[in-house]
Amino acid sequence: MSEEIINKKLENTKIEEKEEEFKNISHENEVTEIESYCVNCEAENGITRILLTKVPFFKEIMVFAFHCPECGFRSSEVRSGGSYELKGCHIELNVTKELDLNRQIVKMEKATISIPSLDFEIPPSNNGSLNTIEGIIKEAITNLTNASEIHTESKEELLGFVSKLSNLLMVDEPFKIIVDDPSGNSFIENPNAPKADTNLKVTNYTRTAEQNASLGLGINEEQQKQQQEDSKKNERVTTTSVSIPSGDLADREVYSLPNQCSYCGVMGECKMVLTDIPYFKSILLMAFSCDECGYKTNEIKPGGAISEKGKTITLRVESVEDLSRDILKSDTANVIIPELEIEVTHGSLGGKFTTVEGLITIIKEELEKNPFFRGDSSDPANRARYQEITSQLDSFIAGKKPFTIELDDPISNSYIQNLFAPDDDPQLKIVEYERTYEQNDELGLNAMNTENYLNNQEENDNEAENEKSEEKESDSK
């Protein structure tokens, strides 16, 4: 499909009217027709019909259908019309049983699917797709089988690999499937949602400059040069101003640093302030704003050293006043609501400094973003469970029902306000625990060396030099 056609249509679509442009599927949807070039017979009177609509799972999409009256050539294409997420997503699923093959998967056009055990990768494509894990593997088997008929010289090798893919469908041994999508719009279904899935791990990451460029979010060379000059100036100004002096006044002083916008790639300004939470510790509040695209975000980073033990904080919410308690959820903490069997794993929400009511509202909004709970294509049982959970959350937010909220933080950087401080709060329970080896490993503490690291570095350098000299000697022989 010609990029000219797409750009021409998008130029005519105003951003502020996006919600009106992308309507739910119905017979009343407006179809735009554009005269376009036929790549088959080179006629210039082909017709491209464009439909902007909303489809379950895919949110907003653009449907393109081309027909040439001269030669009869037809083609169709579907593209995502929704906005990119603020961060990319890396999804890992451990397939341990045949039932896992039925999980639905949304692969957007910028996503890469890989199976590490076979060193197999499905690269980004022009079109997004909605499928199951089994469907993705069967589609790969079909494509490789067809390729073996064309490339006869490597037929045996391709068919051997097809056999390996077919064996995966038996799930005789567990295997891992990974979806990496810099646009952040791909999903793998969690059938236990909103409960945590031990076999599913989702990590959000900040896109690189190359990934932003591939999404069309990059900046041109002139802007890059200007940013480099500005950053050099800011470095000279900031180097002396960022060092935080001692004293209470410094804790309230706001510091600014240049930072690249993860949404559009243009340099914006990140403001930071160091402050204290009574009866807890110092925290760093960071707020970023971009004058170019208007993107704004904020983040909380607790200060101080990593605690020796983890901590579980349990609050029994019994009144409207409890909903107003301050709560700090660090980016390493899990949020658990036992009454609904909800567990929001660390990394899902990031660091949040809000109230109990605010945190419950954020959890509800995150649930509403899950495409497998919405639309007429969703499973009826999942949809009913989702509606029940959101109804219960609304009751909690309105203060109509008591509930329990629990923060499980392996590095003790989370906090819930004690209304009776410095005395004990009868509704608040705090329990410290020893971290497991796996938790320390995930936090990078097992590999951390804080003693004699200079000597260890010298030993590693000497070992590397010895290995190089041995390789040279063996090559000379």
UniProtKB/Swiss-Prot annotation:
GO cellular component terms listed in the entry, alphabetical order: cytoplasm; nucleus
Domain of life: Eukaryota
Organism: Dictyostelium discoideum (Social amoeba)
BP GO terms, sorted: protein folding
Keywords: Metal-binding, Nucleus, Repeat, Zinc, Zinc-finger
Matches recorded under Pfam families: jr-ZPR1, Zn_ribbon_ZPR1
Region (Disordered): 213-243, 442-477
UniProt subcellular location: Nucleus
Biased composition (Basic and acidic residues): 222-236, 465-477
Family note: Belongs to the ZPR1 family.
InterPro entries, alphabetized: Znf_ZPR1, ZPR1, ZPR1_A/B_dom, ZPR1_jr_dom, ZPR1_Znf1/2
SMART domains cross-referenced by the UniProt entry: Zpr1
Principal location: nucleus
Bias type Polar residues, positions: 447-457
Zinc fingers classed as C4-type: ranges: 38-71, 261-293
Molecular function GO terms recorded: protein folding chaperone; zinc ion binding
Protein name: Zinc finger protein ZPR1 homolog
